[in-house]
Amino acid sequence: MSKEIKFSSDARSAMVRGVDILADTVKVTLGPKGRNVVLEKSFGSPLITNDGVTIAKEIELEDHFENMGAKLVSEVASKTNDIAGDGTTTATVLTQAIVREGIKNVTAGANPIGIRRGIETAVAAAVEALKNNAIPVANKEAIAQVAAVSSRSEKVGEYISEAMEKVGKDGVITIEESRGMETELEVVEGMQFDRGYLSQYMVTDSEKMVADLENPYILITDKKISNIQEILPLLESILQSNRPLLIIADDVDGEALPTLVLNKIRGTFNVVAVKAPGFGDRRKAMLEDIAILTGGTVITEDLGLELKDATIEALGQAARVTVDKDSTVIVEGAGNPEAISHRVAVIKSQIETTTSEFDREKLQERLAKLSGGVAVIKVGAATETELKEMKLRIEDALNATRAAVEEGIVAGGGTALANVIPAVATLELTGDEATGRNIVLRALEEPVRQIAHNAGFEGSIVIDRLKNAELGIGFNAATGEWVNMIDQGIIDPVKVSRSALQNAASVASLILTTEAVVANKPEPVAPAPAMDPSMMGGMM
């Protein structure tokens, strides 16, 4: 395929047009009075959303050069979403502001490399000032405020706050679709995995079809149990203790399963067998997690252990285990707290180093199960369109809340970025680096301007007053009042503001230093084939 190439100002101008098209589409959603954007879907009903990254990902421009500019801004939104989970619209607005001011100076003859160094220095100073202004999120009320601001719903804020209180900041909080119209919170305490009993005859409650085991022993193995003789010595020891048994194995089949079921029905002992969770290496890791949580040992050939040699000391223990046809929940495992803490630290380290989004998600789930439980927010709505929009808002709120717990909060509504302007202005830079600093100074005002504009106010007047206001005092665009943003619960996580600024500056600098752009040349559309006269038949 042949290529089309543009150089210097022609290349940058085309990319900037793409940046502006995408940013102008996204920035209308910013703030408490931001509007929605309707996205056409290839099938199903249109998606109505105010989620910046969702909108950015949908935009494809016909002009290849403009599309490259749009895609670079979309990358800013995506990266900010990956790191902080929110702030994608702010990142887009900042990118457009830096590019717009930067292009003016580059076109006027400034050196783009010098400008880039100035931008990097200014952003580093702004980030440091943001961190210095941070307030730790230490209580349930503060968490609820962060979530409420992001989701634009106090009720959602309460759900997320309650969920984090129940499962901890490392716990898994999932968002599912409810069958009804109401949004509700469901918390599963302890370690849960998606494997149910191997036989319905193992239930202890025939009405609910669940098996409840109080103070059970837990046999954990990656082997398949087909011969009852392999575990007979162990069963005899458990029988003497008069305690129930949970078997977690690769499988239980052959004569072993009917023998266990028969003894359960006769009342000889209370036993439930389930398959081990996961597959391959992930299964081994999850079995090890269960063993550490319950204080047991995984009976595996990798450690040179055989089922026939296993003793009661190798079994795990828990206060309670509940098993239904689809899942198993282990509550209050008897594992060593230090061993559990060490395992948690190892998994956290793996989360930080992995490059796979799928692996990171699975590691987060394992971390949550070791840390205390899983909370499920079941989203209800009247229509499918409303449901999709609600789910996106709650996901943003959840991500923002986690970011707030991690690095603290600052005043919201763009106020925090405006508050760091003095720290950037004091940087002593010269030449093109000073120009780069001034570009960042102008960009830091842009989120406040856009929020005010979307709410029907004049952004320049708001920013002028904000520059002279005390730290934390800002403009509440929802009411048109000047308030203490923190006291009013108008807050942003530091991680969100920081990531938005850093990612915007990074990509904007790349655009400013671009000197040539190479794009695929559109293929000419082939003319339609001429109709064969013989096909005309009686039409002649």
UniProtKB/Swiss-Prot annotation:
Chief subcellular location:
cytoplasm
**Compartments, as annotated in UniProt:** Cytoplasm
What SUPFAM superfamilies does its record include?
Answer: GroEL apical domain-like, GroEL equatorial domain-like, GroEL-intermediate domain like
Q: Does the keyword ATP-binding apply?
A: yes
Keywords recorded for this protein, A-Z: ATP-binding, Chaperone, Cytoplasm, Isomerase, Nucleotide-binding
Q: What does this protein do?
A: Together with its co-chaperonin GroES, plays an essential role in assisting protein folding. The GroEL-GroES system forms a nano-cage that allows encapsulation of the non-native substrate proteins and provides a physical environment optimized to promote and accelerate protein folding.
On assembly, the entry states: Forms a cylinder of 14 subunits composed of two heptameric rings stacked back-to-back. Interacts with the co-chaperonin GroES.
**Which family does this protein fall into?**
Belongs to the chaperonin (HSP60) family.
What name does UniProt use for this protein?
Answer: Chaperonin GroEL
Q: Which organism is it from?
A: Streptococcus pneumoniae (strain ATCC BAA-255 / R6)
